[in-house]
């Protein structure tokens, strides 16, 4: 019995020591996750501020600055757009001066992609610029690449579009 008690005592002590050793790394990882969340949520704000004002001179090009040249945009209702240029042409035609995009508060989640960047996902809603009424909502996912100190969206998915129920 004493050997079993001694074994479990050593095992528990080793587990406690390894948990203490892991704690500083966990703090560093949490700080890194917080920094990534702050960075990507800031990118979302900047990207869509330019999107929402794309009828103002220079804002569509500012919006373009966040997008990879070979951007792929997947929209459940509109299909796939294979380049930044095609996406910008569609945005100018269908979005600018018509509606704005709003992030649904509390819906944003950000996940790191090792040696690449991050995934951003959440819910957004769309609101008419003339009436200020929000008419639809959808889920979204953006794949961000971080290369040479610059972040750019390489893939954007907007899906599950549905009307917002009137109250």
Regions found by a protein language model. Give the residues of each.
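Short, low-complexity N-terminal intrinsically disordered segments enriched in polar/charged residues
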Residues: 18-69, 164-167
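A short, structured loop/turn motif at beta-sheet edges
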Residues: 110-118, 132, 144-151
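A solvent-exposed, acidic/Ser-Thr-rich amphipathic alpha-helical stretch
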Residues: 38-39, 57-116, 134
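Generic short beta-strand segments
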Residues: 69-72, 121-127, 160
């Amino acid at each position: 019995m004493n050997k079993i008690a001694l074994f479990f005592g050593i095992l528990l002590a080793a587990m406690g020591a390894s948990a203490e050793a892991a704690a500083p790394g966990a703090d560093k990882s949490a700080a890194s996750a917080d920094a990534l969340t702050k960075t990507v949520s800031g990118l979302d704000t900047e990207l869509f501020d330019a999107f929402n004002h794309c009828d103002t001179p220079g804002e569509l090009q500012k919006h373009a600055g966040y997008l990879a040249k070979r951007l792929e945009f997947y929209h459940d209702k509109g299909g796939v757009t294979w380049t930044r240029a095609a996406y910008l042409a569609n945005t100018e035609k269908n979005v600018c001066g018509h509606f704005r995009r709003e992030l649904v508060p509390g819906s944003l989640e950000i996940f790191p992609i090792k040696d690449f960047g991050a995934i951003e996902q959440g819910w957004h809603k769309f609101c008419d610029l003339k009436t200020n009424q929000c008419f639809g909502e959808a889920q979204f996912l953006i794949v961000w690449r971080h290369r040479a100190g610059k972040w750019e969206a390489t893939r954007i998915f907007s899906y599950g579009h549905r009307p917002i129920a009137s109250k």
